[in-house]
Amino acid sequence: MTSKSTFVLGHRHLLGIEGLSAADITGLLDLSEEYVELNRQVDKKRTVLRGRTQVNLFFEASTRTQSSFELAGKRLGADVMNMSVSSSSIKKGETLVDTAMTLNAMHPDILVVRHHASGAVELLARKVDGSVINAGDGAHEHPTQALLDALTIRRNKGRIEGLVVAICGDVLHSRVARSNIILLNTMGARVRVVGPSTLLPPGIERMGVEVARDMREGLNGADIVMMLRLQRERMNGSFVPSTSEYFNYFGLDQKKLGYAKPDALVMHPGPMNRGVEIDTAVADGAQSLIREQVEMGVAVRMAVLEALARNLPNA
């Protein structure tokens, strides 16, 4: 299979959704559509990255994102290396900059990086010659998650512009929320964040979103309900009285889903905490797109890898 799309991303790295134009996003989504179809065929291989080296460098635990990037790279023909941080020099006191310079000396073409500190991926990108993809940095951004969410929405609703998207839960600690807000605003959606005051960033309205502090108001008229998990690993205090009380007020069950439009669809970036932010009946119900999001993730990451590879020397 040869891509029909001639889209070239005018960036060396993908560090965030911020800085991407609507045309950039549309180009990546259109290219992703080709990979959705390819991934449903028996032969899923392409040779776009043949001879290229992709290093996955994850400083935080990941199941979906890391395995998705690994599969994407291999299906495109790359030599993929997963670097284990638990056994790396980082654990022995090496700085991130030294790690970047060491890796750069091995001439990787693409680095896929997840790090617990906001801005760490951008710092690393300044020190390497290849392309860098942000697979999530602290509470800052997670660009490929926002892209796969956008692809999922577009395939099911036919558009993004004009839709009402309610992002519910722990917005304060969520890089997924930030990237989605930027992308959805860029593409003309109407974005609403929903959650208790303790889990909403101060001044979030400045990002161009509506704010609701209860689910009835927040889900009213929503086309898409995007749930977020409580990110306890980023919390250094008590943000909710208890998980059971949180579920009573902000967990998505069938009753609360009824506040949204009758044809509203449910999304979640995973991993889910069933019975905390989402009820099993909703997560596995007919309005759920959660499994489809995982499928779209591989296609989007293949598209991002190809788009960046087109900018590499001798591409």
From Swiss-Prot:
Record-annotated disulphide pairs:
none
Any idea which positions bind L-aspartate? K92, R175, R229
Q: Which UniProt keywords apply?
A: Pyrimidine biosynthesis, Transferase
Is Kinase included in the keywords of this UniProt record?
A: no
Q: Which residues form the signal peptide?
A: none
- Residues that bind carbamoyl phosphate, according to the entry? R64, T65, R114, H142, Q145, G270, P271
The UniProt similarity line reads: Belongs to the aspartate/ornithine carbamoyltransferase superfamily. ATCase family.
Subunit-structure text: Heterododecamer (2C3:3R2) of six catalytic PyrB chains organized as two trimers (C3), and six regulatory PyrI chains organized as three dimers (R2).
Q: What does this protein's UniProt record list under function? A: Catalyzes the condensation of carbamoyl phosphate and aspartate to form carbamoyl aspartate and inorganic phosphate, the committed step in the de novo pyrimidine nucleotide biosynthesis pathway.
* Name of protein: Aspartate carbamoyltransferase catalytic subunit
Q: Which organism is it from?
A: Bradyrhizobium diazoefficiens (strain JCM 10833 / BCRC 13528 / IAM 13628 / NBRC 14792 / USDA 110)
Q: Encoded by which gene?
A: pyrB
